[in-house]
Amino acid sequence: MGQKIHPIGFRLGITQDHRSRWYADSDRYPELLQEDHRIRTFINQQLANAGIAEVRIERKADQVELQIRTARPGVVVGKGGQGIEELRKQLRQMLPANRTIKVNVVEVNRVDAEASLLAEYITQQLERRVAFRRAVRQAIQRAQRAGIEGIKVQVAGRLNGAEIARTEWTREGRVPLHTLRADIDYAYRTARTIYGILGVKVWIFKGEVLPGQTEAVPREATRRSPQRRLPQFENRSN
């Protein structure tokens, strides 16, 4: 039975960059790695309504530089920069006293072309008791209007409150997971419903990164077609 490698880890150094960029000796490496995990968890919890797509961390000596990619930079920055100052203050209390923290906020250009934001949108819909097929269909339509090349969505668990858990998925366009130069974005989220936890996985193919390029060239965003066929779901439980 074939197993799927993580699409982002598979392409590190080719089309994807590391989310954490620093060097540490072997005795300090576990400490800093756990620190990175705590920082990301804290930011995602504190800014849950800000549409956080990604948190990149760079370290230079005792300086920690954070780059927060968000769909709503105004929520992160706050009025007069108060949001960032409050975030830095809370991070200083959480981290060792000798850490200097710098926060950069970057706005996401194409919100509906980010796998993490689309997965978050689907989980929010599922937690509001929207039928999973409708939630997935709306997410796919939003992504197609953003000009992506292809998208694949998988939902697993007690779908629509069914007694027996199952896995269903659908795909629109191309999602070439075996092509290393393919710019694949991937995200996994969990939706907590009254029937239990549902797992949501989203793969987005943005295009191929050709030699000499740093990212895929986005195609023009497409308008919604009234005659577009509905996504066909497949059951992967057996």
From Swiss-Prot:
Keywords for this protein: Ribonucleoprotein, Ribosomal protein, RNA-binding, rRNA-binding
Keyword Ribonucleoprotein: yes
Region (Disordered), start-end ranges: 215-238
All copies of domain KH type-2, residue ranges: 39-109
Keyword Aminoacyl-tRNA synthetase: no
One cellular component term from this protein's GO annotations in UniProt: cytosolic small ribosomal subunit
One of the protein's GO biological processes: translation
An example Gene Ontology molecular-function term: rRNA binding
InterPro entries recorded: KH_dom, KH_dom-like_a/b, KH_dom_type_2, KH_sf_prok-type, Ribosomal_S3_C_sf, Ribosomal_uS3_bac-typ, Ribosomal_uS3_C, Ribosomal_uS3_CS
CDD domains to which the protein is assigned, alphabetical: KH-II_30S_S3 (cd02412)
Family: Belongs to the universal ribosomal protein uS3 family.
Reported function: Binds the lower part of the 30S subunit head. Binds mRNA in the 70S ribosome, positioning it for translation.
Record note on quaternary structure: Part of the 30S ribosomal subunit. Forms a tight complex with proteins S10 and S14.
Protein name: Small ribosomal subunit protein uS3
Organism: Thermosynechococcus vestitus (strain NIES-2133 / IAM M-273 / BP-1)
Gene name linked to the record: rpsC
